[in-house]
Structure formats: structure tokens, C-alpha cells
Amino acid sequence: MNITKIKERQKRIRNFSIIAHIDHGKSTLADRILEITGTIDKRVMQTQILDSMDLERERGITIKLNAVQILYQAQNKQQYIMHLIDTPGHVDFSYEVSRSLAACEGAILVIDAAQGIQSQTLANVYLAIENNLTIIPVLNKVDLPSADVPRVKGEIKDILNIDPEMAISASGKTGAGVIDILERIVTQISPPKGDPEAPLQALIFDSYFDPYKGVVPSIRIINGTVKKGDQILFMAGKHVYEVVEVGVYNPKQISKDYLAPGDVGYLTAAIKSINHVSVGDTITSNHKPAIQPLPGYKKMNSVVFCGLYPIEINKYEALKEALEKLKLSDSSLVFEPESSSALGLGFRTGFLGLLHMEIIQERISREFGVEVITTAPSVIYHVYNLKGEKILVDNPSKLPSPQMIERIEEPFIKATIICPEIYIGKVMELSQNKRGSLQNIEYIDQQRTKINYLLPFSETIYNYFDKLKSLTKGYASFDYEMENYRVSKLQKMDILLNGEVVDALSLIVHKDFAYSRGKTICETLKSFIPKQMFEIPIQAALGKKIIARETIKAMRKDVTAKLYGGDVTRKKKLLEKQKKGKKKMKTLGKVDLPQKAFLAILSAK
């Protein structure tokens, strides 16, 4: 290995991310960059090339971060090695963005020239500033008839405090402005620092499981070099392996002789144990280890919890394996075994938000062939008992009895909503109905406003975002950050079917909303549970007190149909016998809850 050559090459490396609000055309712009630089042959080019999951292409969103190496011949006749790390735009996946930015020196901030700055644009800019990145603003979709470049440039100056003249006008659709972006990357983003002669320090920013190669970590080399045959040490767990292969993504894997400072790539070391590789860990040399690991990432804590149960009981182990493999690249996913009398064995699983929960559920189904039932999502409550001890409760069934509770605190969020001025009233009404308190209203320009609300997190995890979108005809954007815990009047509500508590349907509700919530759930269940041969009462209860009830009438079989003539005593006898049979059936009968009923309850709230 020629150290002088490595240092020369390092001066020509540029690492950058593309960050944007969801739907601002980030993946399309990435496609054009790959196409114009010849990284991907036009014949194999497909839309959203970096969105490797079918799920990402179908939904038109980026879920996972992806890395790719680009070779670019600049106008100064030098060839530059660029590493583009694509990032998601949805609020639930902001941890993926922070992981990407930790592996970069610069960020391209994509702003839709028609929609302007949205809430997630702001959040991403703050993340980039936190990571001391050079920000290159790009106005995308300038070819649209609705594009308003002067207005959006004004927003860049007023809201982001970035010189609007620095913004590049571009179109991911036509490829206009892409060369300007690449030239700006060359001149403005600094090459990576790092000493190739220092002990190896490589940051793991992603990983996945390959059935042939084992666990494959994606890494960014900070210091030192790594090549085939090296003995490496994972600093968190002190596990030692021998490197089998190193390489880069193009976007498929391409094997290389070595990786040096600034390189973004992968390594394989026949790692069979999933638990040995964790995102944010540092890989170093076993013979000449680094003194301390890299700072890694801010740990993302799960904020939404629900039960995941396999529909087929014998798929429990398959579900466990699926969750373990998904956790490899998704360190925010947490799970522990739990059991339910209604649903059997499953897992209590933690997520970063409802979209995150939905995506994991869909990936388990598609990638591992396991169909699951999800219970109602819940947040973490702080419950204080009479001794003043704090208990963390993420499952309503774990809530102590009311006599043992001194107070319950729930998490609140600071929500930022950007919407057209004409929808302020509707947004405020929705937020007030969700127990929100208005903090601030700021006018961005003549048309748009930024509204800050303090909201209970439990009220927003159901359908707040969907309702916000429909009330504002899709124009509102929503972002949030966790605020603090506050005391609330909360208690557990049980749902009873045929007199039996269904633990999977229990939830923690605010006392003022208990009746309406209970009534809605009972009505929803009534329309989804099929009729039986016996009557089924559906009840919502706070402790021993029933607050709402619906009844599913029994199916009626005409037992007198075979009678001819008018023998009324025979008729009465048969009806009496049927009545006794139904009574017995009711005491022994078990009511099965269809998955549709669970899903309907989630959307009904």
C-alpha cells in the first residue's frame, strides 16, 4: 500500500448526503446524478435506483439510507471520487438521516421550487448544522409551471438564513443543473480528514444479513486502512474477525484491494452472529487498536409500542428471526417476548412512529413471509406509585390498579405545522380536539404560516397526520420533537367481549375522552365481528364501571320450520330448547376477533 498515493487520492474524495422533505424529488435528483456521471448504464436505469426495496418504489418514499460511489471528471480535468449517501425524508426516519450525515462532510439541501420550505426541511437543516456540514441549497423542479423561484429564494434567506444566491436551480426530471451541483460539491465540500497511518477507525452506519456472507456492515473509514486478511476488532462487544472482502457500492457491491480514510464501503468477515454488529460501533485493528471508539450516533429511543403476534401460531420463531434480522440495520427497533390470552405468543415492539411501525410490519410480511396482527399502539407513560417510585409503562395491561397510583405522566411533543393561511382555523380545531395547546403562530409569507403546538404524543400517533393532510387538502407539513412529560388524568379502559376482557384491546385513555372513545370502539367492533349462534355483548369499562355497550344479535335458526299443523305446545318446547342451548353456548362460546377489527379500531380513533 503506497501511503503517498492514498493521501493524494484522499484529497479528491467528496462525501455528501442529499437531504429533503418527503416528496421534494430527492431520489429523482440522485437518479440524474448517477445517470449523468455514468455510474449507472442508461439501459439498466430505473426510477429511484437507490431505493432498493420494492416497498420504497411503491410508496415513492425512501426508507433506508443507501450509499453509492461516483467517479466524476470535473471541469478542472481532475477525477473525483464522490460518495453519495441517500437519506429518507419522513419524520419517522430522521434517525436514518442523522446516521447518513455522520458519514459526510457536506449536504445537498433539496427544496421543491413549487412547495417551498416545509417542516422536515427545517429539521434536516438543523441536523446538518449540528454535524458541521457544508450546505449546498438546490431548488428542484424548476421546470414545473407552478415553480416560484423568487419566493422560495426569499424563504431560504428569511427562514434558513442561507444566502439565496448560493441556491442552484435544477430539475431531477430533465437533469438541468446537475453539472452545477457536481462542480459545487468539488469546490465547496472539503475532502475528508483522516490519517491512513493511524490505527484503523471505521464507523458502522448500516448493516444487513446475507445468507452466504453473513452479516455485512456498511462502513465509513475515518482513520487507518483495512484490507482482506486483516484481523479486526468490534470495539463495543470486543469480537474479533478476519476480513474476507472489502469493497464499495456502485450501487451493487464491487470488491476493492483496500479501503482508506474517506472511503464509504462494506466489509465481510463471515460474521454469523447478528448481535456482534451494531450500528454506530467502531471497527479497529486487533493488532494495533485505536485508543477510543468514534462518537457514533445519538441513540434513538422508541416512542411508539405495540404487540406483534403471528397470525399462524407456529410462525413465532420465524417472527423472532425476522425481527432480529431487521434490527441489524435498524438499531431503533426494540422488541421483547410477551403473551396475550387472546392472541397467544408474540412480541412487544418499539418504533419511532406509526409509519415506522407500518413499514416494519410490511417488511416482515414481504421479506420473511410472516403475517402479523398488531395491537393498538401505545406510548411510554411514567406512573408514580404511592411510595413515589416511577414505573415505566408501555403496555396498558401492565398499568397498576388505580388505588396504587399517585399520578400518571404522559409524553408531550412540540409540533411544527406549516400550512397555507386559509387552513389555520381547521388546523387549530383539530389540534385543540387532540388536547393541544397553541404555542406560537408565525407568518412565513403572505400565503403560509408556521404553527407550533404542544400536543400529547398519544393523541398524535393514531390518525392526527392523516386528518391534518385531509383537512388541508395535502398542503400541510408536520414535524415534531419530543418535549417533556406532564401530569394527565389518565386511566385504563378495558374492552369486554361476551363478558371476557380482551387484553389486546385494552388502552390508556384521558378521562374526559373515555366515553366517546369507548363508544366508538364498541360500535366499530360491532360492525366487524361476525354474528354467532348466541348474543355477544361488547362493553367498554373503566374499572368495574361499564361506560359503553353494543350488542351483536344472535343468528336465528328457525327450529319450528319442520313443524306442520298448529301444535303450539310442540312449538314452545322447541323454542325453549333452543333458548337453553343458546344460553349454554354463550357461557362456553369463544369469540374470535378478526384482524380487520383491530385495524378498524386503529383508524377509528
From Swiss-Prot:
The keyword Cell cycle does not apply. It catalyses: GTP + H2O = GDP + phosphate + H(+). Pfam families: EFG_C (PF00679), GTP_EFTU (PF00009), GTP_EFTU_D2 (PF03144), LepA_C (PF06421). Its EC number is 3.6.5.n1. SUPFAM superfamilies: EF-G C-terminal domain-like, P-loop containing nucleoside triphosphate hydrolases, Translation proteins. GO terms for biological process: positive regulation of translation. GTP binds at residues 23-28, 140-143. It comes from the Bacteria. It is found in: Cell membrane. Keywords: Cell membrane, GTP-binding, Hydrolase, Membrane, Nucleotide-binding, Protein biosynthesis. The keyword Nucleotide-binding applies. It is an enzyme of class 3 (hydrolase). GO terms for cellular component: plasma membrane. Residues 11-193 form the tr-type G domain. One of its GO terms (molecular function) is GTP binding. It is a peripheral membrane protein. Required for accurate and efficient protein synthesis under certain stress conditions. May act as a fidelity factor of the translation reaction, by catalyzing a one-codon backward translocation of tRNAs on improperly translocated ribosomes. Back-translocation proceeds from a post-translocation (POST) complex to a pre-translocation (PRE) complex, thus giving elongation factor G a second chance to translocate the tRNAs correctly. Binds to ribosomes in a GTP-dependent manner. Belongs to the TRAFAC class translation factor GTPase superfamily. Classic translation factor GTPase family. LepA subfamily. This is Elongation factor 4. It comes from Phytoplasma australiense.
